[in-house]
A protein has these predicted regions:
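Extracytoplasmic/periplasmic substrate-recognition and gating elements
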Residues: 96-166
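Conserved C-terminal helix/tail region of periplasmic/extracytoplasmic solute-binding proteins
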Residues: 132, 137-141, 151-245
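Glycine-centered hinge/linker elements that transmit conformational signals in sensory
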Residues: 28-63
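A ligand-binding cleft/hinge motif common to bilobed small-molecule-binding domains
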Residues: 85-100
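Short helix-initiation/N-cap motifs at beta->coil->alpha
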Residues: 61-74
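Extracytoplasmic/periplasmic solute-binding protein
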Residues: 1-34
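Non-transmembrane alpha-helical segments in soluble domains
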Residues: 46-54, 70, 140-148
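Alpha-to-beta junction loops
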Residues: 74-84
Length: 245
């Protein structure tokens, strides 16, 4: 029987790891879309992920019908699983089934890129749409004000923390780490906007940046798609210019 020991598992590893470099695959600069796939920092981040795979540190999900094996954490077979806190925001009897004994489970922020000038962190965006002609736009404004206030209101935070202790079985160490991750994220938040582009170019970029993590050389992958990506980004920027005129 093969003894399995894995450093990293999961589906959501690629973007947090390369965003730590401080460079997303695509960014918005001066109102225009910019392709960063050839940026040296981004290329280095892609090479890092390729090296993780080449050194056998990533779970080969193809051996498990493309399903992460989170239970390996509880079994002591793997170390890290990049995900959201929702994985442990439920009753302890639920999340301990896969992650192991309550006292043995902890989370940490994605490590800082030692070559980056700052500690950049993958930030999620909470967005709300207001339909044209909505009957009560002022109500939407009040809702947004309440949501924003809830992020900083001490009483709201205290209630949330107590819920994490009482309902989710969190320790004070976990609460402190949640605060630390929030602090890091707020200092230098970074988001890749590739997913917000047209479906064709978005899929092309997303598929490409996933390749090094799966064991394919980034420079070869980039060469195969870069011209097409640049062409489509140029078309998007042209449309932006037309809308401005």
């Amino acid at each position: 029987m093969t003894l399995i020991r894995v450093f990293l598992d999961g589906w959501f590893n690629v973007s947090p790891l390369y965003l730590a470099s401080g460079v997303p695959s695509v960014s918005l600069e001066n109102g225009r879309i910019v392709n960063n796939m050839s940026d040296p920092a981004f290329e280095r981040a892609m090479q890092f992920q390729y090296d993780l795979n080449r050194n056998g540190l990533i779970l080969d999900k193809s051996l498990f019908n493309w399903t992460p094996q989170v239970q390996y954490i509880g079994e002591g077979k793997e170390l890290f699983y990049i995900s959201g806190l929702y994985e442990i925001e439920s009753a302890p009897e639920i999340w301990t089934k896969t992650l192991g004994n309550q006292e043995d489970v902890m989370f940490v922020p994605v490590p800082r890129d030692e070559n980056a000038d700052k500690y950049y962190y993958n930030a999620e965006l909470d967005c709300y749409n207001l339909c044209t002609g909505a009957a009560n736009p002022e109500g939407v404004v009040r809702l947004m004000e309440c949501i924003i206030a809830s992020y900083y209101d001490e009483n709201t935070i205290a209630i949330s923390n107590q819920k994490h202790v009482d309902d989710y079985g969190w320790s004070q160490e976990m609460l402190d780490m949640k605060d630390e991750v929030t602090r890091i994220t707020q200092e230098n938040p970074l988001r890749d906007i590739a997913g917000g582009l047209t479906s064709d170019v978005s899929s092309m970029i997303t598929n490409a940046v996933n390749e090094p993590f799966n064991g394919n050389d980034w420079f070869t992958v980039k060469e195969s798609v870069e011209d097409s990506v640049n062409l489509q980004i140029d078309e998007i920027n042209q449309k932006i210019s037309e809308l401005e005129n």
